A protein has these predicted regions:
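Active-site beta-loop-alpha junctions enriched in small/polar residues
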Residues: 18-21, 48-52, 77-83, 108-110, ...
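Short, acidic/polar
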Residues: 24-37, 59, 85-93, 153-163, ...
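Catalytic domains of carbohydrate-active enzymes, especially glycoside hydrolases
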Residues: 33-48
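Active-site pocket-lining/capping segments in soluble small-molecule metabolic enzymes
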Residues: 118, 122-144, 194-246, 251, ...
Length: 286
């Protein structure tokens, strides 16, 4: 099933993201976690892609398990910073061979060895190539309500986003944010630029202070005072911090749904217990 079909539904839905193991030795534990989340009947699941394509085989394997063993629609990620055109074609062939209808097209983070491929300069180039190879596949793209961490001017960031959509991107998923007003303002700004594809908000439940520090360092996401106070108060108490983080994420989701945003993507970090607790708090809403 295409994700655009899911996003056209009027009822609220929740989807989850998982990531593949860095080594094949961890594959079975990731499959087990993904299977546990799939059993919660999300609208779809996404599977990330290691820096420089380091986990491309495992990404497809986990995604195939979700789709073909658990019968949950799935969206594997594909990055282009270290990918050749031949590799992209091979990945698309593998994805289609596993009955998968969706792909998330990204530039991706630089690999640790610094080796890149110059076949694609931007995510928009990758999206255009995927669309030319497989006109029927559903393509997702990333967007950044506070601007990409590497982009100096927000206006430039939205111009790059317009290029993705014009290249054939069917819908967008946001980087995490902790203040819903930032997301609402972002929707107004992109609409003014003529970007009218569905935008799926990405919510990350923060369960430890360390997770917050790392996430902010990587993404540049701002932390509102209300959430900062929560981390300051509960950060040294693991159980309380976990619960407070889940409550905060659930409150974000409830506010989004109350304001007409019916489809939410949760960065569940391979943690079925977190996904389960989020859904428990949303019982009767989703």
């Amino acid at each position: 099933m295409k994700i655009t079909n899911i996003l056209s539904r009027p009822e609220p839905t929740i989807s989850f993201e998982v990531f593949p193991p860095k080594q094949e030795a961890g594959l079975e534990s990731v499959k087990a976690a993904a299977g546990a989340i799939a059993a919660m009947n999300p609208s779809f699941m996404s599977v990330t892609y290691g820096a420089g394509g380091s986990t491309s085989k495992l990404t497809v394997e986990v995604a195939s398990d979700i789709k073909n063993l658990h019968n949950v629609p799935v969206m594997p990620h594909l990055t282009c910073v270290a990918s050749s055109r031949e590799h992209v074609r091979n990945m698309l062939s593998q994805i289609r061979a596993n009955n998968i209808d969706n792909i998330m097209a990204l530039r991706g983070d630089l690999p640790k060895d610094g080796v890149i491929c110059n076949d694609y300069k931007h995510a928009s180039d990758l999206i255009a190539d995927i669309r030319s190879i497989d006109p029927d596949i559903c393509i997702g793209g990333a967007c950044y309500p506070e601007g990409h961490i590497e982009c100096e001017h927000k206006s430039d960031d939205i111009n790059f986003l317009k290029l993705k959509v014009d290249a054939g991107c069917d819908f967008l998923t946001t980087q995490m944010f902790f203040d819903n007003n930032i997301f609402y303002n972002f929707l107004y700004r992109i609409k003014d630029k003529g970007i009218n594809v569905p935008v799926l908000p990405g919510i990350m439940p923060i369960t430890t202070a360390k997770q917050l520090s790392r996430s902010v360092a990587l993404s540049g996401t701002s932390v509102p005072e209300r959430f900062r106070a929560i981390v300051d108060r509960f950060g040294d108490d693991p159980d309380s911090m976990r619960q407070a983080g889940i409550v905060y994420a659930a409150e974000q989701i409830i506010d989004l749904i109350a304001n007409g945003i019916n489809h939410i993507h949760v960065y569940s970090m391979n943690k079925p217990d977190v996904a389960k607790d989020i859904l428990k708090m949303l019982n009767g809403i989703v």
